[in-house]
Amino acid sequence: MFYNFLLYLVIHVNYALDALTFNKFLSLDGIVSWPMIIKDRVYFLSDHEGISNLYSVNLEGKDLTKHTNFTEYYCRNASSDGRRIVFQNSGDIYLYDPEKQELKLLDIDLPTDRKKKQGKFVEVLDYTTEAIANDKYLSLISRGKVFLMRHWDGPAVQLGEKQGVRYKQIQLLPNGDTVVLDTNDDKLTFLSKDGSIKKLNVDLGRIERIKVSPDGKKILISNNRLELWLYEVDTTNLRLIDKSEYDVISQMDWHPDNEWFAYTFPESYSTQSIKLAHISGKVIRITSPYGYDFSPSFDPDGRYLYFLSARHLDPTNDKVIFNMSFQRVIKPYLVVLSNTYSPFNQSLEETTSDKKVEIEGIEDRVIPFPVDEDYYIRIEGAKNNKVFLFSLPIKGYRYPGETLGKLEVFDLDSKTKELYADNVKSFSLTIDKGKILILFKDSIRLFDVNTKPDLNATGKKGGIVDLSRIKVYVDPEREWKQMFREAWKLMQQNYWKPDGLKDWESVLLKYEKLIDRISTRYELSDLIQEMQGETKTSHSYEMPYDYDTAEPLPIGGLGADYEYDKENKCYKIARIYVGDPTNENERSPLRDPGVQLNIGDCIKAVDGEEVKYNILSYLVNKDQVVLDVITKGKTKRVTVKLLKDEKFLIYRYWVEKNRQYVHEKSKGKLGYVHIPDMMYQGFAEFYRLFLSEFHREGLIVDVRFNRGGFISGLILEKLLLKRMGYVVRRNGKELPHPFFSSPGVIVAITNQYAGSDGDIFSYLFKKYKLGILIGRRTWGGVIGINVRDRLADNSAVSQPEFAVHFHDIGLKIENYGVDPDIEVDIKPEDYANGRDPQLDTAIELALKQLEEKS
């Protein structure tokens, strides 16, 4: 983002930081970084001319001088010893001598074994992304490599290219050969047991899903162009079946006759139907375009099409805010494909099983399952009238980690549903739908669909597939090259503007030639991120998974700040962070019952060891400690349970300090709300504070440091609900109407660290004329992402895909930000002295408006 970055200079020198005075002395339209003072000049890196180079100015911020003239790669990571400057440019390190005005490329030879580039074996389950089976074989993808083996014994064979490749979207053919997507060239690829590799050399864009017919002769292909194609293996005929205008056609299934197939079809931004098609080209919509239907799956006998639908709208009252929500809306349904009885309403006479698909009146043959709604995400029809239902628990953001689901089986004969397996990552059925393959966190298991699994049993009896047969070998150098190129290709294919990446091929050449110079996975991340930076677009991220580094040792937290007391040789408690003790991790352990330490108390020893060094070093990898504390001249011994993470406590302390300050300065007239992001935490924080603040005469909404997200519209919706009157009652104070409506005066504070949806909130706050916006210009990144693509080592990469365009200003927020109505900065000395000029200005403006209204 091209901020107007600033450098500050101390113009009044004093040894105490809180006595220093800083003035803005340089402003450039670009990124200014790594400031270094050498003699009477300030040196720094800046990209205000396009490519980052080394510059300097005098101590008055004048006489801007350029010292380097690199035109291809950025100068980065500058440092100085007070006389000279070193910095990085591409894979080289340069030394600049200001006195001699001399630039020198350093010849650095590091005699190391480059251990991180050496080959290694990895655990198969740690990187297993897909697994599938038929009646004989099981195939899976781990670390982007395809392995094939028999269910219970025999060797595991690696198919296709062994290194430098990334396969995905695996499908098994009846003979055990596989069909996959090769992400190196985005081609549909056939991998044979005999080692041969065949490709469908047609440009279909980024293939998102493939589904092979039961006989292995036809393949459905969906892509990022929102198209659905049908490929006939024997004739090599390729036909376009359908195309959406809204989203990827993501789910398909084949009828057992190999002629009919069903697929999801996005009808709008929020609705999706299911269509039924014949290989002849006939296509019909069989569910309403006004709901959200998904997960089509045929009964293996060809009688029914099962699917899930989020259409059961049964609202419940929210327990916190005056609102209603739909907690569980997804229900399983089936379509009777021929004009016969529903399985839930059998006739007295025996009916024959009819596999024929009858189109006429099919939309009237949609029947709900006799089960309650739940958070179902998948349905699969299996042999012997079994139907598998996979659901996830509903949980909030405070419960991180992988979400494991519940797998249930519904029996069409008995009309009952029972638990089949819990803590499931994913599952798939064999081609004949007679066996089920379940992926757990610690195993892959295969069962007959009629068998109740014994998850406590071991070996074959417990359905456990022996994965020790698979050896996943990784050649880092070849893998890094593949990952880099895939990250480049994903950007090429998913970037929001088709012609937006000019000369993208030259960008590949520019950075790919540096790959041989990297030695660690971290350096690969750095290289990918530099390549992504060439888009000059926000939200271009690489999120690494496998740095292969030692886990950092955790440091327990006391929820306090300290100062070393030289006289008593102990750490004096300078501040105890006070949060909300009713919230987890928001109470300082020093204030726990039985501990009750205070500011000024001095920690003399930890676990009997006298504190001689930084106190944090005594809290490493500990959950609980015994402290010897000098309090009121006496030594007290207390046992303290440490915090694993202090950030929630410190954040709550900061918010509550601001809120109390606003209340005191306004004499209770103004409320205060801080929104840390526009995601789950931000939504919770807004209502946590708004519920106790909305009844006041005015409100300050603070979105400084807002990390973005997607719920700004929900916050604005509440702020736009203006108070039109009151509900008067006999006892108690009157209630605002509408309830939870916003007060008449609102002032918002933003800054340069509010971005993405924080940018959007800041802009719409002004546009809706909700009040005055003060602070600093925002981050400037409003082209959104859908992080769905992962590289071979599970690292995630994003591509800017969704550009936010406003009627009046178009795309101008991107790479610029949102200007406040009134600019107010916070200088370093303000931070040092605990002052907040932005908050003070907001209070002043809100009180002035209240006075004018009265």
Swiss-Prot record:
List the GO terms this entry assigns under cellular component, sorted alphabetically: cytoplasm
* List of residues binding substrate: G709
What is the predominant subcellular site recorded for this chain?
cytoplasm
Q: In chain numbering, where does the site feature Transition state stabilizer fall?
A: D757
Its subcellular locations are: Cytoplasm
One function term, GO molecular function aspect: serine-type peptidase activity
Q: Name one Pfam family in it.
A: Peptidase_S41
Signal peptide bounds? none
Q: Which UniProt keywords apply?
A: Cytoplasm, Hydrolase, Protease, Serine protease
Region listing for PDZ-like, in residue ranges = 554-646
Name the top EC class.
Answer: hydrolase
Output the InterPro entries linked to this UniProt entry: ClpP/crotonase-like_dom_sf (IPR029045), PD40 (IPR011659), PDZ_sf (IPR036034), Tail-specific_protease (IPR005151), Tricorn_C1 (IPR028204), Tricorn_PDZ (IPR029414), Tricorn_protease (IPR012393), WD40/YVTN_repeat-like_dom_sf (IPR015943)
CDD domains referenced in this protein's UniProt entry, alphabetically: cpPDZ_Tricorn-protease (cd10828), Peptidase_S41_TRI (cd07562)
In Gene Ontology terms, what is a biological process of this protein? proteolysis
**EC number in record:** 3.4.21.-
- Highest rank taxon of the organism: Archaea
The annotated active site, in chain numbering, is H539 (charge relay system), S756 (nucleophile), E814 (charge relay system)
Similarity field: Belongs to the peptidase S41B family.
What is the recorded function of this protein according to its Swiss-Prot or TrEMBL entry?
A: Degrades oligopeptides in a sequential manner.
* Stated name of the protein: Putative Tricorn-like protease C-terminal subunit
Q: Which organism is it from?
A: Sulfurisphaera tokodaii (strain DSM 16993 / JCM 10545 / NBRC 100140 / 7) (Sulfolobus tokodaii)
What gene name is listed for this protein? triC
